[in-house]
Amino acid sequence: ADFVFMESKKAKLFVNSPNAIDGNRIEKCDTSCAAFQSEEAGLADFTGSEDEILSQIRELVSILPANNEDDMSYSECEDDLNRICSDIENCVGATDLALAQISDDNFFMEVKKDYDPSMVTGFIRLNGMTVGCVANRTEVYGENGVKEGEYDAVLSYRGCEKAEKFVSFCDAFNIPLLTLVNVKGYKASKCTERR
């Protein structure tokens, strides 16, 4: 599937049930739950309540082309393409907020939000056209404006994998891509070296 939606409380996704994994019990680590599949496995792109999921599906379908030859991923735009983004300098580390600032009507739909939050992937609209976005992120802010996380300005294996899959999707559907990058290099870890 191109995009996976999971209801956060009852949905389950697994190859092997959590109890079939050696040394694991469902009470210890529920590898089939939406949180695990979105945060650790990176399989779930969107999670939420049933109403939130239905809303996310409608929103995603409204911005994507019907197929790779369709160029109907446009919408009427009343927002000025040349408007000033007065607060964008405060979004240097929080690139999800920067993308929302430059988008038509501040629209930004983040994909795989919970999987490696140091890499942002998602869709914006520019002059009515759907544009895929990839950006590294060094700061995460909650809905209340409080900083919830901080990351080094380096690329991780999981972040690169997340970006690569998103870029491949955009390429397959001829969706233009915008990249915002501010990195010093690659994350120095055994995981990075193994990959």
Q: What annotation goes with each model-predicted range?
A:
Residues 29-30, 106-108, 171:
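Short secondary-structure boundary micro-motifs
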Residues 34-37, 51-157, 161-164:
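Intrinsically disordered, low-complexity segments enriched in small/flexible residues
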Residues 1-4, 13, 156-170, 177-180:
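Extended, hydrophobic alpha-helical segments in both membrane/secreted and soluble proteins
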Residues 4-6, 14, 47, 98-101, ...:
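Structured core elements
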Residues 141-146, 171, 188-195:
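C-terminal catalytic subdomain
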